[in-house]
Amino acid sequence: MPNIYSGTDDGWIAAEDTTFAGARDRVTGTSSDSTSTRDSFSVRASLTPGRPAPTYYITRSFFYFDTSSVVYTPASAEMKFFGNVNGAADLKIVKSTQGVGVGLATSDFDSITGGGAGADNTSNVTVYDLATTTTWSTSGFNTIPLNATALQDMAGEDTLKCCLIELDHDLRNDGTGMNTTNYSGLWYADAIGTLKDPRISYTETVDNAVFFGANF
């Protein structure tokens, strides 16, 4: 299976506030990083109690893959992330629109196709995974099968952009029942070599067109 590795502009964008809506619905994040090799809070929706107010944290990770060499819609594909430290968050892969070639900026925090403030976006976004990721290895690759929409975009777009987002609170817009440990970590493309880089592994489609020749 060929591999397409994430570009080095991948990374995370975080937002924090004293209210859930203030963190989750920000247009611009409060911090970002597209140069680290790995992070412990790559995807996060957590709450830290405090006085006079608690602090809510939302972190999303963004990736892009050069798919310009994919001519035909793949027969199948998997996105793979090497885990790091915690693995408590339930995750979705969704289509995104962040800039490429300039590094992630805090202004990319809400660059999710179909996303919107103050709403449950599970039905609004373009989902790329076949199923929700509910388990996360912190010492190996986490393999996530991609759906037909992702396969079509691999063939139809020169760059496949996506966001790894927490499902239960962030994507669903639900600030209830949050805790201090709901986050998952992973490695990014800035790690030396490609051993732990995020990647898409895919099965190519063979062109089965049949040509009939004739002598005239």
Identify the meaning behind each predicted range.
Residues 57-60, 139, 195:
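Short, solvent-exposed loop/turn segments at the edges of secondary structure
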Residues 215-216:
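Short, solvent-exposed loop/edge segments of extracellular or virion-exposed proteins
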Residues 1-27:
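Juxtadomain low-complexity/linker regions and immediately adjacent membrane-anchoring helices
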Residues 5, 85-160:
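Beta-strand-rich interaction/scaffold domains
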Residues 2-12, 151-212:
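Proprotein-processing/basic-patch segments
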Residues 51-54, 87-91, 100-103, 167-183:
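Short, surface-exposed beta-strand/loop "edge" segments at domain boundaries and coil↔beta transitions
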Residues 65, 77-79, 93, 144, ...:
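Residue-level detector of buried hydrophobic side-chain packing
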Residues 23-86:
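A short beta-strand-loop element at or near the start of a globular domain
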